[in-house]
Regions:
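Boundary regions of SH3-family modules and the immediately adjacent low-complexity/disordered segments
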Residues: 1-25, 31-68, 72, 78-80, ...
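Helix-loop-beta junctions that constitute the ligand-sensing/allosteric loops
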Residues: 86-88
């Protein structure tokens, strides 16, 4: 990684969902939701967590303990992850807040809690 190498890809999406797979000095090797890998300077990477919906059947629920559905979500929709526990993540999508099942999103490991 470094500034002396050619640029292979330019990201223009806001709140890009990436996985950091390696690190070297001030650089992170990242994997994006489409399977692309490359190096990003750490100043371009935020600790805020975001997700992208990967299943057409994804639903936003009021809470994980009941079946009150708030929204049906389209594949590719993005939002912010506030916390995750067990099989669920508390998320925010624009003005909506609720819970999503981890299996419906890309951006969090299935065994990850925070």
């Amino acid at each position: 990684p470094g500034t002396n190498f050619p640029i292979e890809l330019i990201y223009v999406k806001k709140h890009l969902v990436i996985e950091v797979v390696d690190a070297f000095d001030n650089w992170y090797k990242v994997l994006d939701e489409e399977g692309n890998t490359g190096w990003l300077h750490k100043s371009l990477v935020s600790s805020r967590r975001y997700f992208v919906v990967k299943n057409d059947s994804a639903k936003l629920y009021k809470n994980p303990k009941n079946n009150i559905e708030l929204l049906f979500l389209e594949t590719g929709l993005r939002g912010k992850i506030e916390s995750c526990r067990n099989d669920w993540c508390k998320v925010k999508i624009k003005k909506y807040s609720g819970w999503l099942q981890k299996i419906d999103i890309w951006g969090v490991y299935q065994n990850e809690n925070f």
